[in-house]
Swiss-Prot record:
Task of the protein: Methylates ribosomal protein L11.
Pfam family, one: PrmA
Protein name: Ribosomal protein L11 methyltransferase
Stored SUPFAM superfamilies: S-adenosyl-L-methionine-dependent methyltransferases
Localization annotation: Cytoplasm
């Protein structure tokens, strides 16, 4: 299916007015983009506060219209719709809708983390290098949930779990994956020796993806998933939390409380520059063993004090 895409650049303060006009002319969807993307001025917007909408200083609005829309007629209408809005830089182009799931699966390839952990798309063969070794192979279809192994925060956690598995820390114990997404970390822990895993996420779609991936990996009877309010109150020898730094800070007492005395905790999803605040919040409970960084993202790991 094809669409007519209309793109216009504006200041953040006038974004809502442009969006309202585009929608009034029948826009099927409006996407907001950073006008400085892929430049040195690019600025990440990760997590707004409650009731807050955070945008870039200069925004590109990209609106989709039916492909048969008369572009010149639409432009004339936009220019006369509301005084003060500048449509001089508007751009039109025809875009073709793609099977994005197929495109993504074509790009998602098997990956290795650490010594023996492999994340393999569910529809691909296990890599040759995984044969002949005690590989921990996780078959994965993330669906709509976060966690395919391609993001640095996930990779940092997978390498940590791989190391724990190699050191025998996971053997015979339980693991909590807080912010489980697709279930990738919980499943990796099970494949690396954990007996049982619990996944917690505030997104019901993530819980569904975790269950489906557990079935795909034949460990469904060893994984339970919960919304945060329903998660059992207990302690675990190993806890991993791959969420945002602000959430790690807000939930510090709760997350530390999940870790058994002498247990291991990994905190990920931390941008460079945010680690000091996270370390400060966990200092009362955690003896830090180390930090690892990849592409500006940091993982902190430590041991819960007795």
């Amino acid at each position: 299916m094809a669409f007519l895409e209309v793109s216009v650049q504006c200041q953040e303060r006038s974004q809502a007015r442009y969006e309202e006009v585009l929608e009034s002319f029948g826009a099927l969807a409006v996407t907001l983009l950073d006008a400085d993307a892929d430049t040195v001025r690019e600025r990440g917007v990760f997590e707004p506060g409650v009731g807050e909408t955070v945008l870039w200083d200069v925004v590109v609005l990209s609106a989709l219209f039916p492909v048969e829309t008369d572009a010149l007629g639409l432009l004339a209408g936009l220019e006369g719709a509301e005084p003060g809005l500048d449509w001089g830089g508007v751009r039109f182009r025809v875009v073709v809708d793609e099977d994005w799931e197929r495109v993504w699966m074509d790009q998602f390839q098997a990956m290795r983390f650490g010594e023996r952990t492999f994340i393999v798309p569910w529809n691909q063969a296990v890599p040759v290098e995984a044969s002949g070794m005690d590989a921990a192979v996780v078959r994965l279809d993330p669906g709509l949930a976060f966690g395919s192994g391609t993001h640095p925060t996930t990779g940092l956690c997978l390498r940590w779990l791989d190391r724990l598995g190699g050191d025998g820390v996971l053997g015979g114990g339980d693991v909590l994956d807080f912010g489980c997404g697709s279930g990738i970390l919980a499943l990796a822990a099970l494949k690396l020796g954990a007996v049982y895993a619990v996944g917690v996420d505030n997104d019901p779609q993530a819980l569904l993806a975790s269950r489906e991936n557990a079935l795909r990996n034949r460990v469904a009877e060893r994984l339970e998933v919960y919304l945060p309010a329903e998660a059992p109150v207990r302690r675990y020898p190993v806890v991993v939390a791959n969420i945002l730094a602000s959430t790690l800070v807000a939930l510090a007492e709760r997350l530390a409380g999940y870790v058994a005395p002498g247990g291991r905790l990994a905190l990920s999803g931390i941008l460079r520059g945010e680690e000091e605040e996270v370390l400060r919040c966990y200092a009362v409970w955690l003896d830090v063993l180390g930090c690892e960084e990849e592409d500006g993202w940091i993982r902190i790991d430590g041991v819960r004090r007795c």
